[in-house]
Amino acid sequence: MPGRRDTEDEITAQLQLNLTAPILLTRAALPALRASGNGLVVMMSSAIGLVEMPFYGTYAATKAGIAQFAEALRRELYGEGVGVLTVYPGATSTPMMSSSDAGADLGFDYESPDEVASAMLAAIADDEISVVRGGSERSAMIAANRDDPASVDEKLAGMKADLERAVSEHSSI
């Protein structure tokens, strides 16, 4: 929950970095993208934007928000020669994740940035509208969250203490 760990400044920074900045950048780039007749907007969401995890409330909200913005934008731009791709990486071995001890046992299958980039490039080549990463465990959790969210609540409740310990020093900004 944002109130447990994130300061007001951290909450504001996450909203600005993960939601406000991409929206404003897209707005500034749209005239040139439209004029090109063959543009592409790539939005970086997160698998946590699809299945929200305890202790990542603010981060999940920003990533779900950018995914919803991307979907609305894709529909707004449909037929105008500008596509929108939303990327939902799972845990990625970046400096941001270096302070997290959450591993595969908690559903965090780490990938390299190169693996995420390769998947994104493949999705672009195939004219996909989204690419979801994070391994088979994450895919199963996404499906369960859509079909039976209470089962995900129950599963995460059983992991909550371990997850809290694993991410106690982690900052998602």
Placement of each model-derived feature along the sequence:
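Conserved mid-core segment of classical short-chain dehydrogenase/reductases
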Residues: 1-12, 55
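Active-site helix of classical SDR
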Residues: 26, 62
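Active-site loop-to-helix junction immediately N-terminal to the catalytic Tyr of the SDR YXXXK motif
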Residues: 52-60, 72
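A short helix-coil junction within the Rossmann-fold of NAD(P)-dependent oxidoreductases
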Residues: 28-37
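Alpha-helical segment proximal to the catalytic Tyr-Lys
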Residues: 31, 75-76
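C-terminal helical subdomain
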Residues: 86, 102-140
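Residue(s) in the substrate-gating loop at a strand-loop-helix junction
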Residues: 46
